[in-house]
Structure formats: C-alpha cells, structure tokens
Swiss-Prot record:
InterPro entries hit by this protein: Dihydropteroate_synth-like_sf, Enolase-like_C_sf, IspG_bac, IspG_bac-typ, NO2/SO3_Rdtase_4Fe4S_sf
The name this protein goes by in its record: 4-hydroxy-3-methylbut-2-en-1-yl diphosphate synthase (flavodoxin)
Entry binding sites for [4Fe-4S] cluster: C270, C273, C305, E312
EC number: 1.17.7.3
Top-tier EC class: oxidoreductase
Reaction catalysed by this enzyme: (2E)-4-hydroxy-3-methylbut-2-enyl diphosphate + oxidized [flavodoxin] + H2O + 2 H(+) = 2-C-methyl-D-erythritol 2,4-cyclic diphosphate + reduced [flavodoxin]
UniProt family annotation: Belongs to the IspG family.
C-alpha cells in the first residue's frame, strides 16, 4: 500500500536479453552468475533452475574454453531463463556460443584480439541480434591505465569503458550495455555516475567481489541503493561469496526497499523489546522461509505491541499488532480479526496465502478486461 518511489529513472536506449527488456524504463532486471563448473552440465542446469525459481531474470555463465562452449550448448537447451556467456581472450568462443543461441555476450572488445577479430564478433552479434555487455572491472584495468592513474580511479574506469564503447561505435553497433564495477563502494558509485553522463546505453550495476553473504549484501545495498535512488541503473547483480540464490534474494530486497520493483512479501517487523506480546522474531523468520514461494507483491507488518503496530498496519496489505493473548489483524488498513498469539505462525501463513490468491485473481481479471 506504500506509494511508488519518487525516483526519476535515467533515460537510456533499450536492448533485449532474450525476451527481457533492458533500459528505456523497463523493470530493472535482477541477475546472477553460476558458480559451478560449466562442464558439469547437470549441476549448472540445476543451479540455473534454482535461480529461476527465486526470480532471476537473467543468468550469466562463464565460458572460458571450447569445452565449456560445448557444455553451454547443452545447458541452453535445458533452461528457459536468458543466458549471458562470460567470455575473455578467445573470440572463437564468442562465435561458438552465438551459434548455440546465447542471449548476450559479456566481453571486453579490447581483450579478445585485434580489430578484425572484434569485427567478426560484433558482426556475428549483429546478424544474430545478440546484445553485448562491456564489463569493466577495477581489478583488471588495462596496464597503461594503471600506469597513468597509479591506481583504479573513477576516471580510469570511465576511460576504460569509453575505449570499449568507442570500439563498438566505430563498428556501428548499438545493442550493448555497460558496467564499471569495483569492490570499493565509493569508487564504483562515482564511476557509474561519470559513465551515466557520457552515454545513453543501459547500465548494468554491481559492486564486484563485495564479500560474503552478510558484508557483501550490506556493501551492495549501499552502493546499488545510492545509484538506484539517483535513477541510475537498468539491470543489476549482487555479487556474493555465497549461494547465487542469495544474490537474487538480496537484489530484489534492494529494489523492494526503494519501492522500485516488488516480488514477493516485504516484511515490516519491529526489532522487539519487552513490550512484545508474541514472538515476533521467530514469527518473521518462520514466515520468510515458509512463504518463499509467494511472488505476489505484498507488504506485511508484524509488530509486537500497540505503540507502532496500528500505524504500520494502516499502510500494509496485512498487518499484525501485538495484544494480550490475542493480536489484532488488519487487512488493507482495516482491523478484521484477532489471532491467537500461541498459534501466530500457522494462522498468519494461512491469511497471507489467502490474500495472495485473492490479489492474484484480481489481477488476472483486470488483465482479461484490458485484453477485451
């Protein structure tokens, strides 16, 4: 029930990664990358499907050799989500995965060979309508830029990116997006700000090598949150040294927190104190796990007492306000019922699922009416 975010998105061109629109006001796509051996087709397919189940719009797969390219062919045949092939150094791998139906190529034109080889890759991408992502990283800047600037700086990342952009411009290829990632939040943020002023292509956001599940999520939330709040960014990846599934969850949590894009339940919960009338922490933790399958956007407030509970419930899809033995249940801001504190988790799960079904049905009817 909260209003949409007052964010003015940066204007950009649009490309398509498979059937997923990127840029020009399209929903910000959330993506991840497999961390299996690509030659282990079964493990890679299983991981991609797990990512798809939690909402991944796009998945990137590393393809460092021709053996992985052959495995990519088999993987592509068994999944539905668009796949990006991550390729460095060998232009022939790019040509091979293009033949196998890749949805996007992640390359740096400067590291796959001479001008003729770059032209071959770009011509192939153009012929097959495959977009390219230019991926600049502070950890792999060109040697001359390292010498020129002494260390990675926003200006160095921008100069590297613009070299690659110029490569594609000279070849009259416009179907690309760009990233300028760094593990330092301020370096990444300022690099993206500079780049956003220079080009109108879509930007892929990320804080690279952000860290483990907790610290990486925090760094990504700060860095990506700053950029997204300024309207910068058309697709994102949260890079974690963790299960890639967590990257998707954190990515959507960042977008939900900024009210940019919603998927699933946005839980609003108090940190608890001695006033709580039921086990708020246990309830929230249990419901987050039980309700991972719900993709319907909903705000659910779970507050342990009457200090802030009623106010939060007024602006939530469903809200619980702690009371003695029984707690008040609100639906769309209206008090509807009371729930037994000793059976809170099961009761609230049932109410949330019922509300999700009701909202899904209402949307289905609306779509049918529009189509008529």
């Amino acid at each position: 029930m909260h209003n949409q975010a007052p964010i003015q998105r940066r204007k950009s061109t649009r490309i398509y990664v498979g059937n997923v629109p990127i840029g020009d006001g399209a929903p910000i796509a959330v993506q991840s990358m497999t961390n299996t051996r690509t030659t282990d087709v079964e493990a890679t397919v299983n991981q991609i499907k797990a990512l798809e189940r939690v909402g991944a719009d796009i998945v990137r797969v590393s393809v460092p050799t021709m053996d992985e390219a052959e495995a990519f062919k088999l993987i592509k045949q068994r999944v539905n989500v668009p796949l990006v092939a991550d390729i460095h150094f060998d232009y022939r791998i790019a040509l091979k995965v293009a033949e196998y139906g890749v949805d996007c190529l992640r390359i740096n034109p400067g590291n796959i060979g001479n001008e003729e080889r770059i032209r071959m890759v770009v011509d192939c991408a153009r012929d097959k309508n495959i977009p390219i992502r230019i991926g600049v990283n502070a950890g792999s800047l060109e040697k001359d830029l390292q010498e020129k600037y002494g260390e990675p700086t926003p200006q160095a990342l921008l100069e590297s990116a613009m070299r690659h952009v110029d490569h594609l411009d000279r070849l009259n290829f416009a179907q690309f997006k760009v990233s300028v990632k760094a593990s330092d939040v301020f370096l990444a943020v300022e690099s993206y700000r500079l780049l956003a002023k220079q080009i109108d292509q879509p930007l892929h956001l990320g804080i690279t090598e952000a860290g483990g599940a907790r610290s990486g999520a925090v760094k990504s939330a700060i860095g990506l949150g700053l950029l997204l709040s300024e309207g910068i960014g058309d697709t994102l990846r949260v890079s974690l040294a963790a299960d890639p599934v967590e990257e998707i969850k954190v990515g959507f949590d960042i977008l939900k927190s900024l009210r940019i894009r919603s998927r699933g339940i946005n839980f609003i919960a108090c940190p608890t104190c001695s006033r709580q009338e039921f086990d708020v922490i246990g309830t929230v933790n249990a419901l987050e796990q039980r309700l991972e399958d719900i993709i319907t956007p909903m705000d659910v407030s779970i507050i342990g007492c009457v200090v802030n509970g009623p106010g939060e419930a007024l602006v939530s899809t469903l809200g619980v306000t702690g009371g003695n033995k029984k707690s008040g249940l609100y639906e769309d801001g209206v008090r509807k019922d009371r729930l037994d504190n000793n059976d809170m988790i099961d009761q609230l799960e049932a109410r949330i699922r019922a509300k999700a079904s009701q909202l899904d049905e209402a949307r289905r009817i609306d779509v049918q009416q529009v189509e008529k």
